[in-house]
Amino acid sequence: MGSSGLGKAATLDELLCTCIEMFDDNGELDNSYLPRIVLLMHRWYLSSTELAEKLLCMYRNATGESCNEFRLKICYFMRYWILKFPAEFNLDLGLIRMTEEFREVASQLGYEKHVSLIDISSIPSYDWMRRVTQRKKVSKKGKACLLFDHLEPIELAEHLTFLEHKSFRRISFTDYQSYVIHGCLENNPTLERSIALFNGISKWVQLMVLSKPTPQQRAEVITKFINVAKKLLQLKNFNTLMAVVGGLSHSSISRLKETHSHLSSEVTKNWNEMTELVSSNGNYCNYRKAFADCDGFKIPILGVHLKDLIAVHVIFPDWTEENKVNIVKMHQLSVTLSELVSLQNASHHLEPNMDLINLLTLSLDLYHTEDDIYKLSLVLEPRNSKSQPTSPTTPNKPVVPLEWALGVMPKPDPTVINKHIRKLVESVFRNYDHDHDGYISQEDFESIAANFPFLDSFCVLDKDQDGLISKDEMMAYFLRAKSQLHCKMGPGFIHNFQEMTYLKPTFCEHCAGFLWGIIKQGYKCKDCGANCHKQCKDLLVLACRRFARAPSLSSGHGSLPGSPSLPPAQDEVFEFPGVTAGHRDLDSRAITLVTGSSRKISVRLQRATTSQATQTEPVWSEAGWGDSGSHTFPKMKSKFHDKAAKDKGFAKWENEKPRVHAGVDVVDRGTEFELDQDEGEETRQDGEDG
């Protein structure tokens, strides 16, 4: 690292002096990485303004025969900072003021060369980095319809990659730092939006599959998404690859045994390979190897690298001894952060169709809950309790009628829900009301509906039958759907929360934020398995639905999902607590599936069902733990062995629990994130947005 004998700890002044002395009289730097590491990591210890102030004090107070030489090297160090991290000198007003003061002091001392070295007037604007939500520039020319059936996999992969990179490159050093230190997404909207995009892609994949009425058609959609995943891998977009594979591996899709029977062996083989690539086995060793073998433009699986940062932060203290920086920790953190920062600055050669980008952005802004999606899956292919599922990604375990508890949970705040609806309607009209007359034509509506599964027909929204949909009609439509969701909500239930340490990345079921961390990341309901932040547990609007538990693990038949083509191996099964069948007659009971529209699909249930197994919990039994249905990536192995093999776990990115029970409608608990709409600046990678 070129620490020049600093050892494992040093004061900030010692670090700065060492970095300054590494520049020669011509401003050239030797092969040491220390100056870059210090400039990258300094905000872990003090602000950029404070660092510039320290350098200015050293510049002013320089004395002795070599003071002129030392002052020149300080200016070389400042120039190096400006060249390597120009965005800081455009976005940080305190740093800008301090730099101008630095120039004034140098001018007063008669060092005109020094003044020219720290000139920041030519730095381009990085204002796009701090605009979390931007409006798109409405094009008056032509319209493009993102018809999923007609869009080639490479086109879809490229546009998803464009959205992913645009979200990824806005995440700043302080966003990473805030999450690693505080372990939450509070006051971190940029990172939160990146997570929302991942979730939106995963849910959209599931809904596009479930929007098809026949197993053959659903298999065709799965095949297309597998081809999209292959193209994403070619584009080196690992984060979206994980979202797509995760959506296909979700229990709502993996349980569709009739659909899986229509998949070709080649598709299944490709699915196996993609699933293995994102496996968490060996600390994501397959992904890490593939990622390291790539060069140039690539998008990492952000969660994996954030976990690396958290691990270093927990193990090493920031300071050792008195007022000394832990250089070992600083170096370890810089390895990951330096790579993330450099990848954000990498340019791509994508040429997206901005109309498709805008429509795809809206398509990913979904309001369907995990309950909605899983119930729709059951409607399309009802569960057969007498047969083992042929889809190897589907656990099969006994279930129990839900046990209702006492107590009342407050209803969702209508003000918040209405705000979400207004944002959705505004977003639609902002993108499709091209002449700004307050109406959307049937042609524009068909462009929208092609990518929003289960949206009602045009005539349903067009209440006055004038051939146009007004903003009021669309508002009334969604408000009516919302009221139908709430009118039959019935009593809520008090959760029995317990502070938990999670073994896998997990989502808060209230705010959709990550519960990542090392220990005690959040709270889990001992009765229903709901997970949330400490600050969210009193705000959670979700019924507590208990299920009975068997006294031992031996009666459980569930297993973590396997490869899409292989039956579960008996020597690799994680067993979960079994449950006993209830005695209530549910023949007369029914559920009503409320999708994103007001349309309902009623289905009779022979028995209540619970969701699939999850990897959120450890494999051992713990009294009071409920199983939790969630988005998991399948465990898989390429070969079968008679002897027990090492289990392979997979990253879990969503933790909204799908549950089905008799006589209760869906409660919408989705969190709305308004995705970015302005693409104009982002297409110029080397221009004004850097």
From Swiss-Prot:
Q: Which InterPro entries match?
A: C1-like_sf, DAG/PE-bd, EF-hand-dom_pair, EF_Hand_1_Ca_BS, EF_hand_dom, PE/DAG-bd, Ras-like_GEF, Ras-like_Gua-exchang_fac_N
Q: Which family does it belong to?
A: Belongs to the RASGRP family.
For binding Ca(2+) 2, which residues are annotated in this chain's numbering? 462, 464, 466, 473
* A GO cellular-component term linked to this record: plasma membrane
Q: Which residues bind Ca(2+) 1?
A: 433, 435, 437, 439, 444
Q: Does the keyword Calcium apply?
A: yes
| Residue ranges constituting the Ras-GEF domain according to the UniProt record | 152-383
Zinc finger Phorbol-ester/DAG-type: from-to: 494-544
SMART domains attached here? Answer: C1, EFh, RasGEF, RasGEFN
Please give the residue ranges the record annotates as the region Disordered.
667-690
Q: What does this protein do?
A: Guanine nucleotide exchange factor (GEF) for Ras and Rap1.
Give one GO molecular function term.
GTPase activator activity
Q: Which residues form the N-terminal Ras-GEF domain?
A: 3-125
Q: What is this protein called?
A: Ras guanyl-releasing protein 3
Name the UniProt key words of this record, in alphabetical order. Calcium, Guanine-nucleotide releasing factor, Metal-binding, Repeat, Zinc, Zinc-finger
| GO BP annotations listed | MAPK cascade; Ras protein signal transduction; small GTPase-mediated signal transduction
Q: Where is the EF-hand domain?
A: 420-455, 458-484
SUPFAM superfamilies (UniProt xref): Cysteine-rich domain, EF-hand, Ras GEF
